[in-house]
């Protein structure tokens, strides 16, 4: 194991180098990943986020993995943009069960000018509660990223999904370069980036390596890198894809950790299908972030109490955030709710 792969942050990874990491003996790869992980993080702390779908279904994009796409009949009930107050109530519940970051996702190709004021109010309200804020709203232009940053958004999620070479087999309604441009706008606006991909869509090892190379060779690494295992949903074109080999999934986490040593690597969608032993291996491989709660946008996620029981058995604790005194925090929640109720846009959000 070279020093260059234990502690140094690089942005010049080659396909040959990354494939060599994947092809190491499993235990050697895990040892290397855990060594890198310990050089930058407390190995027994995991960042905990909660994800809420603020607008569900009828998305005009044709992503073959997604039950929210309007192109496929998955039986998903379409919902309009959630009212601001309801979003804040969900954020308060998320904080109460231990989440430190609240992520809000909308099934849009991009947010419209009509939607943006409501979205900005959500960010401000959640931020006032002392939670980190994250959103995934689709493609953004430069002015939208500036507005979100000004409202206090900490993270923007915009996944690359897979390698540039395989991307066209999965999505045709948005280009890879458009995704990279959105990430550049987010970074230029001063926000942190959450960007990763999905395993199990029929991609090759070269594609998995290619995705990680795209992320690791960005001018700055994403602060958060979600690695998703495809959740196969009836009605989507990928519903009959073969399951991902569990060891291959763990290898993906480990290589992500080595390539992006200071990023949080998130064990994301598909965790419901993972047994406790696989999740423990994921943490050993360097995963140090999870989504917490019962629902991950439109598919099941392990129940929160099960997560905490597993954490206790493994000696893992949720990563701490800067805490406000309880009375200060409660006042912030109440003030945020009052401000939303007095806003003209508050009651109209559901009809946006």
UniProtKB/Swiss-Prot annotation:
Cofactor binding notes: Binds 1 [4Fe-4S] cluster. The cluster is coordinated with 3 cysteines and an exchangeable S-adenosyl-L-methionine.
Cofactor(s) named in the record: [4Fe-4S] cluster; [2Fe-2S] cluster
Record-annotated Radical SAM core domain positions: 44-262
Keywords: 2Fe-2S, 4Fe-4S, Biotin biosynthesis, Iron, Iron-sulfur, Metal-binding, S-adenosyl-L-methionine, Transferase
Reaction equation(s) it catalyzes: (4R,5S)-dethiobiotin + (sulfur carrier)-SH + 2 reduced [2Fe-2S]-[ferredoxin] + 2 S-adenosyl-L-methionine = (sulfur carrier)-H + biotin + 2 5'-deoxyadenosine + 2 L-methionine + 2 oxidized [2Fe-2S]-[ferredoxin]
InterPro entries: Aldolase_TIM, BATS_dom, Biotin_synth/BioAB, Biotin_synthase, Elp3/MiaA/NifB-like_rSAM, rSAM
SUPFAM superfamilies with a match to the protein in the record: Radical SAM enzymes
Molecular function GO labels: 2 iron, 2 sulfur cluster binding; 4 iron, 4 sulfur cluster binding; biotin synthase activity; iron ion binding
Transmembrane segments: none
Pathway(s) of this molecule: Cofactor biosynthesis; biotin biosynthesis; biotin from 7,8-diaminononanoate: step 2/2
GO terms (BP aspect): biotin biosynthetic process
One Pfam family named in its UniProt record: BATS
SMART domains in alphabetical order: BATS, Elp3
Binding, [4Fe-4S] cluster: 59, 63, 66
Sites where the protein binds [2Fe-2S] cluster: 103, 134, 194, 266
EC annotation from Swiss-Prot or TrEMBL: 2.8.1.6
Broadest EC class assigned to this enzyme: transferase
Subunit structure: Homodimer.
PANTHER family found in the cross-reference section: BIOTIN SYNTHASE, BIOTIN SYNTHASE, MITOCHONDRIAL
Stated family: Belongs to the radical SAM superfamily. Biotin synthase family.
Function: Catalyzes the conversion of dethiobiotin (DTB) to biotin by the insertion of a sulfur atom into dethiobiotin via a radical-based mechanism.
Name assigned to this protein: Biotin synthase
Organism listed in the record: Pseudomonas putida (strain ATCC 700007 / DSM 6899 / JCM 31910 / BCRC 17059 / LMG 24140 / F1)
Taxonomic lineage of the native organism: Bacteria, Pseudomonadati, Pseudomonadota, Gammaproteobacteria, Pseudomonadales
């Amino acid at each position: 194991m070279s020093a260059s792969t234990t502690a140094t942050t690089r942005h010049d990874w080659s396909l040959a180098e990354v494939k060599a990491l994947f092809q190491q003996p499993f235990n050697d790869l895990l040892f290397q990943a855990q060594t890198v992980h310990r050089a930058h993080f407390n190995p027994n702390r995991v960042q905990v986020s909660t994800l809420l779908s603020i607008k569900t279904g009828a998305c005009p994009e044709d992503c073959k993995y997604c039950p929210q796409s309007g192109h496929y009949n998955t039986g998903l009930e379409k919902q309009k943009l959630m009212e601001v107050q309801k979003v804040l109530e969900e954020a308060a519940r998320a904080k109460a069960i231990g989440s430190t970051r609240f992520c809000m996702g909308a099934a849009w190709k991009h947010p419209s000018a009509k939607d943006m004021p409501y979205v900005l109010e959500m960010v401000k309200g959640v931020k006032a509660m002392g939670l980190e804020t994250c959103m995934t709203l689709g493609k953004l232009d430069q002015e939208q990223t500036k507005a979100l940053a000004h409202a206090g958004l900490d993270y923007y999620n915009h996944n690359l999904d897979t390698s540039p070479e395989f991307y066209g087999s999965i999505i045709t309604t948005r280009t890879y370069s458009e995704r990279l441009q959105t990430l550049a706008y987010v970074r230029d606006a001063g926000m942190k980036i959450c960007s990763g991909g999905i395993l199990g869509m029929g991609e090759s090892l070269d594609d998995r390596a290619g995705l990680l190379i795209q992320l690791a060779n960005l001018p700055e690494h994403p602060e958060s890198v979600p690695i998703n295992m495809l959740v196969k949903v009836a009605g989507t074109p990928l519903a009959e894809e073969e399951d991902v080999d569990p060891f291959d999934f763990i290898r993906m986490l480990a290589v992500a950790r080595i390539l992006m040593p200071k990023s949080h690597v998130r064990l994301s969608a598909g965790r419901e299908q993972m047994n406790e032993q696989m999740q423990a291996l994921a943490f050993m491989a360097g995963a140090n972030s999870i989504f917490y709660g019962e629902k991950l946008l439109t598919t099941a996620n392990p129940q929160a109490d099960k997560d905490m029981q597993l954490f206790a058995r493994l000696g893992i604790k949720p990563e701490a955030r800067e805490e406000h005194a309880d009375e200060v925090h409660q006042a912030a929640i109440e003030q945020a709710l009052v401000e939303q109720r007095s806003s003209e846009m508050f009651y109209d959000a559901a009809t946006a």
